């Protein structure tokens, strides 16, 4: 079940403040955030985020195709260790 339309998308207020500060200063550094649940809005297009992925931060460059998704979708939290290959039993 999705979020109610009357509520609108969730975006962290701290994250919005960081984005506004960066747009005013013209700085192009990545924005560090722990808010994986924040929805990507059209204002985010062209910005780079460092999204917390458990132990480290994943670099996420936002494009138009990402609008409507959440930041956490683009920062995987698990590392796949390959299953057995040649010589493994």
UniProtKB/Swiss-Prot annotation:
Q: Name one GO cellular component term.
A: small ribosomal subunit
Q: Which GO terms describe its biological process?
A: ribosomal small subunit assembly; translation
Q: Name one GO molecular function term.
A: rRNA binding
**Which keywords belong to this entry?**
Ribonucleoprotein, Ribosomal protein, RNA-binding, rRNA-binding
Ranges that cross the membrane: none
HAMAP family noted in UniProt: Ribosomal_uS19
Job of this protein: Protein S19 forms a complex with S13 that binds strongly to the 16S ribosomal RNA.
Similarity comment: family membership: Belongs to the universal ribosomal protein uS19 family.
Q: What is this protein called?
A: Small ribosomal subunit protein uS19
From which organism does this entry originate? Akkermansia muciniphila (strain ATCC BAA-835 / DSM 22959 / JCM 33894 / BCRC 81048 / CCUG 64013 / CIP 107961 / Muc)
Q: Which gene encodes it?
A: rpsS
